[in-house]
């Protein structure tokens, strides 16, 4: 087994979710299709609720910002109280959500609605989050060694908490010290990692970031964050240069903490 020694100054391990803690197949084949298949029914059921209206308002604002994009789907403001008007608006939201998802967009508006839909599904027991078998034992070991563990994902903080609170391993939220999403910045921007360090109250070089995406790893490195690229089944392939340049692990168990000996 290849062992990657964690630098002595590291006190925080920052984890990506998709392709790192959780199989991409779970996200691509279960989580995202659930949204596309159920968004219309969800909107019709929850439309009158304040939370749903806030979600729609945020999506409408995003649609206005996207108006210049090819194929952008507008969301009209309500023009009356008629049933036809309501159904047209719901369909516009459905079309907008599906358009954004077809482009794999990570807008806060989209992520917020997805998070609320997943909350309804997880709390109703309609799905449980999947984690790679090495994740929970490794995170427990890190915490016993005094490490802080944080999550940084393009999925909303609320969605992250749902995954860790309703997993096949049970409720494992207690293993996580905190959560970050795109509200702090995008994962391919180095400034996001500086903001995360400020929020945690540490230096960027006290953080080890584990991700499967090399663009994110590069952005983190620019901020003086330590990185390791996680190679998992189903993840995008790496170039020969990337394989040579980055520290690679295929399991969290391959991390060696000098402080734990």
From Swiss-Prot:
The broad enzyme category this protein falls into is hydrolase
Q: Gene3D superfamilies this protein is in?
A: 1.10.720.60, HAD superfamily/HAD-like (3.40.50.1000)
Protein name from the UniProt record: Enolase-phosphatase E1
Binding of substrate: at which residues? 153-154, 187
Q: Extract one GO BP annotation from the record.
A: L-methionine salvage from methylthioadenosine
The record's keywords, sorted A to Z, are: Amino-acid biosynthesis, Cytoplasm, Hydrolase, Magnesium, Metal-binding, Methionine biosynthesis, Nucleus
Q: Where in the cell is it found?
A: Cytoplasm; Nucleus
Can you list the GO cellular component terms from the UniProt entry? cytosol; nucleus
Q: Which family does it belong to?
A: Belongs to the HAD-like hydrolase superfamily. MasA/MtnC family.
Q: Which cofactor does it need?
A: Mg(2+)
Q: What is the lineage of its organism?
A: Eukaryota, Metazoa, Chordata, Craniata, Vertebrata
Which superkingdom?
Answer: Eukaryota
Q: Name one GO molecular function term.
A: magnesium ion binding
Question: In what pathway does it function?
Answer: Amino-acid biosynthesis; L-methionine biosynthesis via salvage pathway; L-methionine from S-methyl-5-thio-alpha-D-ribose 1-phosphate: step 3/6; Amino-acid biosynthesis; L-methionine biosynthesis via salvage pathway; L-methionine from S-methyl-5-thio-alpha-D-ribose 1-phosphate: step 4/6
User: Cofactor stoichiometry and binding?
Assistant: Binds 1 Mg(2+) ion per subunit.
Predominant location: cytoplasm
Q: Write down the SUPFAM superfamilies for this protein, in alphabetical order.
A: HAD-like
